[in-house]
UniProtKB/Swiss-Prot annotation:
Was identified as a high-confidence drug target. Residues 1-23 are annotated as: Disordered. It is a multi-pass membrane protein. It is found in: Cell membrane. This is Cytochrome c oxidase subunit 2. Subunits I and II form the functional core of the enzyme complex. Electrons originating in cytochrome c are transferred via heme a and Cu(A) to the binuclear center formed by heme a3 and Cu(B). It comes from Mycobacterium tuberculosis (strain ATCC 25618 / H37Rv).
């Protein structure tokens, strides 16, 4: 019998497949399996690919919203790419260059390696520069204020609801011109004298000579929609028209946010005195329908219930709606006249009753 020497055993161990090995092919199979499971999760959840690739952002209904969405998605993709590279290098170094018991020397050092340090400095600078450039481009687009908006809306926020007014409408095609500002109501908000002191001089208020209840900075219009505890305010807007929003708060800081605008603006009390820009515009609204809006600034007890609805209709329907309002119809009656639901359909009022009297919300 031929003895089995160590050489024979070594050759046999080399021929026998090692447990747990598989090389690159196994890694590719695992990657393909992960991708298939991810696609299956998206399909089963009922999400569309556009929603999944949007990383949680709505589609957007204005050109500014689309630009903001693209900027966000691009920034996330760039961040993920950088993250994958960095994480990959960390794991690769930890797995393949970890210290072994047989190591007797220090690994190769890269300190003071000028070419490497230049590369690791220039690449992040270029990435940040590109992101900064596109951020400024989108920001300037979103903050652009044109001189001739076709619709001007006054937004007044207060704890815990909204008032919307139509200050001016001037369609470029000449089919609708309307001046809805109400200067008389605005003048009525001027602070009254607070009396006279012991010398017979008129007392002035503590805030720039005005009393603390002064609201002369608020705008008032002939056609307004006022939210109440029983009715969500519905702001009716036309599609395809440049719209300007002028915002002011009657009390604390609020925020005007329509998720499909992909844009939130704080609503400040007395914006001029607080050095706050209270005007923004959208180029147009590209989709008709109902879209919920929220206050996005913590403003007190019922902040979470401070909702409103934006109802986007065609320009012809908007003209008919505004004429109904000018003729004295309520917001609900004017909406019904253009075959729209008279009340909000995206949210419901907060029931102010308590205990067993309050009905349970449906749905």
């Amino acid at each position: 019998m031929t003895p089995r020497g160590p050489g024979r055993l070594q050759r046999l161990s080399q021929c026998r497949p090692q447990r747990g090995s598989g090389g690159p092919a196994r890694g590719l199979r695992q990657l393909a399996l992960a991708a298939m499971l991810g696609a299956l999760a998206v399909t089963v959840s009922g999400c569309s690919w556009s929603e999944a690739l949007g990383i949680g952002w709505p589609e957007g209904i204005t050109p500014e919203a689309h630009l903001n969405r693209e900027l966000w998605i691009g920034a996330v993709i760039a961040s993920l790419a950088v993250g994958v590279i960095v994480w990959g290098l960390i794991f690769w170094s930890a797995v393949f260059h970890r210290k072994k018991n047989t190591d007797t020397e220090l690994p190769r050092q890269f300190g003071y390696n000028m070419p490497l340090e230049l590369v690791l400095t220039v690449i992040p600078f270029l990435i940040i520069s590109v992101l900064f450039y596109f951020t400024v481009v989108v920001q300037e687009k979103m903050l652009q204020i044109a001189k001739d908006p076709e619709v001007v809306i006054d937004i007044t926020s207060f704890q815990w609801n909204w008032k919307f007014g139509y200050q001016r409408v001037n369609f470029k095609d000449g089919t609708l011109t309307y001046d809805g500002a109400d200067p008389e109501r605005k003048r009525a908000m001027v602070s009254k004298p607070e009396g006279k002191d012991k010398y017979g001089e008129e007392l002035v208020g503590p805030v720039r000579g005005l009393n603390t209840e002064d609201r002369t900075y608020l705008n008032f219009d002939k056609v307004e929609t006022l939210g109440t505890s029983t009715e969500i305010p519905v702001l009716v807007l036309p599609s395809g028209k440049r719209i300007e929003f002028q915002m002011a708060s009657a009390d604390v800081i609020h925020a005007f946010w329509v998720p499909e605008f992909l844009f939130k603006r704080d609503v400040m009390p007395n914006p001029v005195a607080n050095n706050s820009v209270n005007v923004f515009q959208i180029e147009e609204i590209t989709k008709t329908g109902a879209f919920v809006g929220h206050c996005a600034e913590m403003c007190g007890t019922y902040h979470s219930m401070m909702n409103f609805e934006v109802r986007v209709v065609t320009p012809n329907d908007f003209k008919a709606y505004l004429q109904q309002r000018i003729d004295g119809k309520t917001n609900a009656e004017a909406l019904r006249a253009i075959n729209q639901p008279p009340l909000a359909v995206t949210t419901h009022p907060f029931d102010t009753r308590r205990g067993e009297l309050a009905p349970q919300p449906v749905g």
